[in-house]
């Protein structure tokens, strides 16, 4: 590597000049370990190295960082460094061209940092705003969660904007959406921005003034809604959490929310989901990149594990909703409906979590294709409106940048400004600033075979936990030595002992969205109307339908929060069928895999990550299949 790699192929040292990048791409069964070597740079400074913005710790805390599962990443250094690399990679090199990390991407981070500081100042200066925000989720005009589609028109709300009453631009951190074609580096940029936010020297607090006193008077009840002056009603667990929060008041770093709108990513928790992941600088101020199976780090929802892994970057489980498709374009109407519910959950969090509010949103999106231009990028417009996006970043796509500028034309702003956006029913939404950034030269084109392997790995990891190098990693039948850092599972995900359980057909309520295929309306008999739409929920009947039994076998089911509290042992969750919106807006509690169907005994055998009672008997099926081989 340009004469700057030393040592054997198993252990070698790589010298990184200032503002350089060491890139590697792993193939199946390849593993790599990297550590930052102690010492000084040629200019006498302390060395530094980071991966997607996550700092590699050196000095007295020197440690090895493992990588596997076909990971593709880059080690960047601002001041220069020497790293030691163990293992082999099919592709590894020092980038010759300058990386945008040191110019455009870091400038974008500084732009977002200014907006976060402005939001913090606004919250500190307006104590009354905190009370208004906290009480907004209790406003009778605000649509109750999971009973009515947030954008549904009602008699009392003909404009369909009641769900947006909780939104206020004041004290709101940046809401940035990353756009670009497939394999443009969108997720990598999202991780870099999130890691830089977590590592920021800023303190995401309300300070010691009147605003802090008002926030102190707000308490969280057992139902997750904020009530004023509820100290006496706090459980012991909530009081303990409060004391821990007080200790964290001076912790540096922002608390952003990462939203994943790409259902093919599978992170978190699995493919076919849309998720909002609240981050915090504790326990670790970074999102690990050990495996592409955990694009945003590890958490209980990602792995099915009860305790978080040792390398968990965050202790808060994501809000995940089930889309049921890996490609949003297969049912874009349903995608928009799920996006509305996810955005509503984010707004509710921002109304009660002031750290997250001032830290803002970072939104990852699916790759834009040519066909999206035919309907004027309708899904992008809907997401911008739903999440009140104020900054759109376009990666490496000149035409898309021009199209976004036309759709959301507005001057760049650095203060809170609002404007009516077409189709917003008169809502005052933030002006949108469109920014074009270059694509990194290290971006790797991913084929469908790789994506299929990654999806299978994500599902397997959910049920079985992480994997180690172990003796299965052999060379000519001789086990290879375990690399540093690979004695534990990648990402700190613990190994699990999945458990099979048998459930009667009539006990598990399973729904799907629409039919697999719909005949055109013109093919229907004269005067007849369609009974099932592409957004309507259909309850499966495996007892009487052989087709439903076939569709269930080998499928992965999303277990959702029972809409009406759930039934007791041996009882279904619902005495009457819930509404579509009660199912669509319900958060995912976990997943089960349908391993077997017994048509004679009318029972279904499902695999869960661990033994114990299932968290729900209400499930949704989609296109996610997996065979446990």
Curated annotation (Swiss-Prot):
> What are its GO biological-process terms?
mRNA 3'-end processing; tRNA splicing, via endonucleolytic cleavage and ligation
Under SUPFAM superfamilies, the record lists: P-loop containing nucleoside triphosphate hydrolases
**Localisation per UniProt entry:** Nucleus
Q: Report whether Nucleus shows up as a keyword of the record.
A: yes
Q: Name one GO cellular component term.
A: mRNA cleavage factor complex
Outline the segment boundaries, as ranges, of region: Disordered: 142-166, 562-582
For this UniProt record, give its keywords in alphabetical order, as a comma-separated list: ATP-binding, mRNA processing, Nucleotide-binding, Nucleus
Pfam families per the record?
A: Clp1 (PF06807), CLP1_N (PF16573), CLP1_P (PF16575)
Which residues are involved in binding ATP?
A: 21, 72, 183-188
What are the Polar residues biased-composition ranges?
148-159
Query: Which residues does UniProt assign to the signal peptide?
Result: none
Give the residues annotated as coiled coil: none
GO MF annotation terms: ATP binding; polynucleotide 5'-hydroxyl-kinase activity
UniProt key word Lipid metabolism: no
Q: How does it assemble?
A: Component of a pre-mRNA cleavage factor complex. Interacts directly with PCF11.
- Give the protein family: Belongs to the Clp1 family. Clp1 subfamily.
Q: What does this protein do?
A: Required for endonucleolytic cleavage during polyadenylation-dependent pre-mRNA 3'-end formation.
Q: What is this protein called?
A: mRNA cleavage and polyadenylation factor CLP1
């Amino acid at each position: 590597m340009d004469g700057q790699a030393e040592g054997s192929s198993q252990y070698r040292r790589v010298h990184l000049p200032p503002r350089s990048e060491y890139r590697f791409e792993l193939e199946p069964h390849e593993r790599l370990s990297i550590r930052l070597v102690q010492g000084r740079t040629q200019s006498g400074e302390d060395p530094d190295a980071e991966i997607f913005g996550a700092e590699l710790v050196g000095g007295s805390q020197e440690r090895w960082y493992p990588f596997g599962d076909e990971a593709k990443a880059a080690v960047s250094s601002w001041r220069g460094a020497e790293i030691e690399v163990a293992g082999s990679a099919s592709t590894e090199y020092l980038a010759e061209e300058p990386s945008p990390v040191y110019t455009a991407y870091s400038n974008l981070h500084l732009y977002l940092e200014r907006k976060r500081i402005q939001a913090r100042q606004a919250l500190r200066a307006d104590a009354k705003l905190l009370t208004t925000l906290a009480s907004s989720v209790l406003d009778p005009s605000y649509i109750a969660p999971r009973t009515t589609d947030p954008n549904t028109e009602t008699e009392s709300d003909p404009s369909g904007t009641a769900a947006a009453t909780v939104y206020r631009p004041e004290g709101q951190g940046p809401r940035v959406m990353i756009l670009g074609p497939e394999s443009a580096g969108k997720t990598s940029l999202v991780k870099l921005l999130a890691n830089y936010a977590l590592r920021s020297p800023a303190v995401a607090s309300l300070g010691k003034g009147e605003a802090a006193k008002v926030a102190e008077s707000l308490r969280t009840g057992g139902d997750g809604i904020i009530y004023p002056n509820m100290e006496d009603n706090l459980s012991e667990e909530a009081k303990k959490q409060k004391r821990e929060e007080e200790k964290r008041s001076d912790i540096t770093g922002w608390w952003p929310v990462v939203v994943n709108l790409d259902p093919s990513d599978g992170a978190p928790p699995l493919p076919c989901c849309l998720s909002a992941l609240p981050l915090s600088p504790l326990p670790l101020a970074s999102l690990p990149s050990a495996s592409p199976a955990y694009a945003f780090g590890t958490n209980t929802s990602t792995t099915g594990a009860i305790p978080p892994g040792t390398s968990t970057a965050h202790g808060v489980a994501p809000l995940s909703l089930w889309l049921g498709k890996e490609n949003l374009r297969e049912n874009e109407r349903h995608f928009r409906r799920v996006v509305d519910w996810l955005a509503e959950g984010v707004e509710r969090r921002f109304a009660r979590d002031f750290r997250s509010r001032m830290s803002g949103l970072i939104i990852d999106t699916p790759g834009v294709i040519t066909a999206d231009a035919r309907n004027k990028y309708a899904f992008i417009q809907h997401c911008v409106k739903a999440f009140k996006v104020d900054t759109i970043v376009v990666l490496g796509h000149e035409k898309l940048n021009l199209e976004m500028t036309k759709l959301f034309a507005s001057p760049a702003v650095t203060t809170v400004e609002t404007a009516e956006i077409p189709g917003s029913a008169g809502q005052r939404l933030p002006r949108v600033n469109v920014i074009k950034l270059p694509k990194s030269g290290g971006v790797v084109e991913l084929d469908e075979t790789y994506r299929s392997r990654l999806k299978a790995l994500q599902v397997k990891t959910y049920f079985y936990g992480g994997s180690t190098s172990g003796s299965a990693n052999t060379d000519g039948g001789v086990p290879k030595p375990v690399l540093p850092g690979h004695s534990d599972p990648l990402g700190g995900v613990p190994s699990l002992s999945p458990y099979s359980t048998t459930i009667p057909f009539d006990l598990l309520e399973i729904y799907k969205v629409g039919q697999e295929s719909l005949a055109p309306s013109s093919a229907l008999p004269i005067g007849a109307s369609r009974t099932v739409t592409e957004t309507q929920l259909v309850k499966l009947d495996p007892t009487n339908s052989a087709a439903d039994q076939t569709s269930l076998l080998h499928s992965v089911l999303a277990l959702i929060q029972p809409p009406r509290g759930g039934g007791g042992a041996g009882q279904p969750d619902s005495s009457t069928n819930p509404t579509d919106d009660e199912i669509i807006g319900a958060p995912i509690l976990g997943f089960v895999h349908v391993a077997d169907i017994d048509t004679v005994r009318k029972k279904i055998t499902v695999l869960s990550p661990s033994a114990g009672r299932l968290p729900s008997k209400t499930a949704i099926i989609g296109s996610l299949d997996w065979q446990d081989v």
